[in-house]
Every structure is written in C-alpha cells, then in structure tokens.
C-alpha cells in the first residue's frame, strides 16, 4: 500500500516524483522539479491526473509543498535520528518517466553534506535516475526516512536523500505560514 501514496509530479517542462504526507492532500516534492514553472499536476497510482497548488517552498533544502483536493492514503515521516548505516531501504519514483518504479538498497552513510552546505543528507546506494527527484526513500516499515534529491554524476550508487526530520521541520514551517 505504500506505493499508493507516491505520485508523479508533472509540469509542462519536467517530470519528477512526490509523496502524500496527509489525508487531506499535502504532497512533498523537490523544488527543482517545479522550478521552470507552469501548471502543476500529479499522477496518482490509480492513474488519475489531478491539478496541484503550490503552497510554499524551502529553497535551501530544495523542498516544495503542494496541495491536491481529495482524501488520500499517506506516508508517515520516520525519526531520522534513529537511522543506522547498513539498513535496507527502497526508493519509489518516476525515473525517466517509468512511473512507480521501486528500487532497493541500503543506507550507505548519514549526515552527509549536500550542495547547499547543510549536513542533512542520507547517502544511499539505491539506483536514482532523473525523475526520481522528490520521491520517498522508505524504510522496511514503510515510513519515509528521506526525500530523494540528487546523485553524484559519473559515479555509481552515490545517491542522496534529505533526511525526514529536516523534511518535517521545513514542511511544518511552510504549512504554518499558510
């Protein structure tokens, strides 16, 4: 059932991934998926295309909060302070337009520094490709431990996800303003 809370996020010029974090339709994705602008739509697991409204962004952490109408199954954010290197994880996303693709791997490192200079990233060997951005990195209990954000080009198995505690703080700040 975890996969039912993952969505494809689409604009006129880009496609990425996202996930639902509340029953009333809040969706999290990476801001860079939306950055070129245009109307935002999401594709649900049951093949519905729904317009989405941008609620707010955290540019530093490359996060965006969207809102869609309806009632949804959603994913919970885990406590990323409890993560351990070597734990099994899965990524669900939309790599190269292949909707709802599932890949697996492990947590390779914690507290890695991202291109933004903050040490809030999980290193993983999960296969991440263009279109995976904004999708969840999930533990074996089906909870989100991170949002897939970037990979190191020219290297294999060097993917990075913003940790769930940072997501929670950012989303609470964004939603609290609206």
Task: List PLM regions with ranges.
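Short pre-catalytic strand/loop immediately N-terminal to key active-site residues, enriched for Gly-Thr
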Residues: 73-76, 122-129
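Conserved active-site neighborhood of the chymotrypsin/trypsin-like protease fold
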Residues: 13-17, 22-100, 117-118, 168, ...
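C-terminal cap/linker of serine protease catalytic domains
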Residues: 52, 144-178
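A short, Trp-centered hydrophobic/proline-enriched beta-strand micro-motif
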Residues: 1-12, 17
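Short, acidic/hydrophobic/Gly-rich beta-strand patch recurrent on exposed beta strands
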Residues: 8-10, 41-43, 64-69, 105, ...
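Gly/Ser-enriched beta-turn/beta-hairpin loop segments
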Residues: 2, 55-62, 110-122, 153-154, ...
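Short beta->alpha transition motifs characteristic of CBS
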Residues: 30-35, 108-109, 130, 146-153, ...
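Catalytic nucleophile loop of clan PA
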Residues: 19, 128-148
